[in-house]
Amino acid sequence: MFNQTQFFVLLAVFTTSSVLGNNNDVKDGAASGAHSDRLGLWFGPRLGKRSLRISTEDNRQAFFKLLEAADALKYYYDQLPYEMQADEPETRVTKKVIFTPKLGRSLAYDDKSFENVEFTPRLGRRLSDDMPATPADQEMYRQDPEQIDSRTKYFSPRLGRTMNFSPRLGRELSYDMMPNKIRVVRSANKTRST
């Protein structure tokens, strides 16, 4: 595995240097100003500097060289023994999830019958049977007559506003006069309402 990675790194460095090496030719051995002591290094283009010549032919040649290098990499990778090649990621699910219930809980929870247990609110005192410990549900959850009204209140009573909402000022609608069922009729001549 280590030899394989060394091979690919060496091949990638060789192809990159051969592609980029063609663009950094120093002509006639002349130094280029401030970069005269850095002949062998290339630091990339300066930001904001635009090239005077637009050469699509050079870019096309560089692209073809990169494609050729990638093709060579694939060829030599296919020549490697099968054990040294990378395995494809598995697409199948091989791990099964096994459900384990929590301790103390059985799957047949509904089949259990619970016994009535007497509740003593304080130690040493028991309530008599004729006096319930808590108020009945009807007493506890009985709604006020104001809440039974089917229409919702538009103002919160805690703000001190208890007036009924009317759609227009000075006009009270009587909802008793409105029909329970509304008849919807379609036009016979296929006109559309806007």
UniProtKB/Swiss-Prot annotation:
Any one GO BP annotation for this protein: neuropeptide signaling pathway
GO CC annotations on file: extracellular region
Key word Methyltransferase present: no
Tissue/organ expression: Synthesized in the subesophageal ganglion and released in the hemolymph.
Molecular function terms from GO: neuropeptide hormone activity
Signal peptide as annotated in the record: 1-23
Domain of life: Eukaryota
In-chain residues carrying the UniProt-annotated modification Leucine amide: 47, 103, 123, 159, 169
Recorded family membership: Belongs to the pyrokinin family.
Task performed by this protein: A hormone that controls sex pheromone production in females and pheromone responsiveness in male. Also mediates visceral muscle contractile activity (myotropic activity).
Note: Juvenile hormone seems to allow PBAN release, which then induces pheromone biosynthesis.
Record protein name field: PBAN-type neuropeptides
Organism: Helicoverpa assulta
Highest classification ranks of the organism: Eukaryota, Metazoa, Ecdysozoa, Arthropoda, Hexapoda
Gene name per UniProt: PBAN
